[in-house]
Amino acid sequence: MEPEFLYDLLQLPKGVEPPAEEELSKGGKKKYLPPTSRKDPKFEELQKVLMEWINATLLPEHIVVRSLEEDMFDGLILHHLFQRLAALKLEAEDIALTATSQKHKLTVVLEAVNRSLQLEEWQAKWSVESIFNKDLLSTLHLLVALAKRFQPDLSLPTNVQVEVITIESTKSGLKSEKLVEQLTEYSTDKDEPPKDVFDELFKLAPEKVNAVKEAIVNFVNQKLDRLGLSVQNLDTQFADGVILLLLIGQLEGFFLHLKEFYLTPNSPAEMLHNVTLALELLKDEGLLSCPVSPEDIVNKDAKSTLRVLYGLFCKHTQKAHRDRTPHGAPN
């Protein structure tokens, strides 16, 4: 290996292992995201905004994404997401267990996406292979393009760019190069924080908001059934904190002594005590993605109530999905 190639490889950041030469065909290239790029605040924010958008879109289908890198590769979530965004039905099997069937499903979905975006295959910054191989950059390029096409008012962080390491197999060995990859458009305006996903939800048509509420009410009633309780009105029935505390106890395995809360609160102060206790429990469990005022819950603010229940919904719907998913699928 010539000195310049050795020097290039020595520039790889700690934590990025150079591939063996046999992993790349001659002339082949592969991108790596160094740890410093992964930890870039704007890069992390972009992933967060996209995940919240996907989860809000797929909430009526009880589908929850926890990781864009790990959850998108097999085409299942992309299939459901694109069908809902484009309001069409794709001829692809719902469940694909083998690598071959997953790639076929992904091919069908990406061909439909590219047609919708009016892109030739060579123009797209993603491919079946890159998505299937869990290439985070390709996945982000794809999701950003879908968001711009189907929800242009989604407030993505602007000018997100990350440093990537490109490894190329040449006649003389492996050569590395540092490049900057642009993920979202540059804006000359002062960057604004992304809009809250629930603020965006409540700007949609009432039937879409109601569909989300209905999905969460169904989830809550499934969990409260063993207690002989049910919820009909999400906006009002959580205001005193009692059902919220009982729901948290059921889902998170907490035993709450009756001395710790008011089972039949008779005043706003007692209701506020219950709701404050519930929010503290959720915060301790990492289930509050952003601050919620207990007064808003007591005052029957639908958006705040929905935000609180959404954290529980995501965690336990995802857990149920993992429990049902077969492991060790054959290739």
Swiss-Prot record:
Residues 17-39 are annotated as: Disordered. Residues 44-151, 210-317 form the Calponin-homology (CH) domain. The keyword Repeat applies. It is found in: Cell junction, Focal adhesion; Cell membrane; Cytoplasm, Cytoskeleton. GO terms for molecular function: actin binding. The keyword Acetylation applies. Belongs to the parvin family. This is Gamma-parvin. It comes from Homo sapiens. The lineage of its organism: Eukaryota, Metazoa, Chordata, Craniata, Vertebrata.
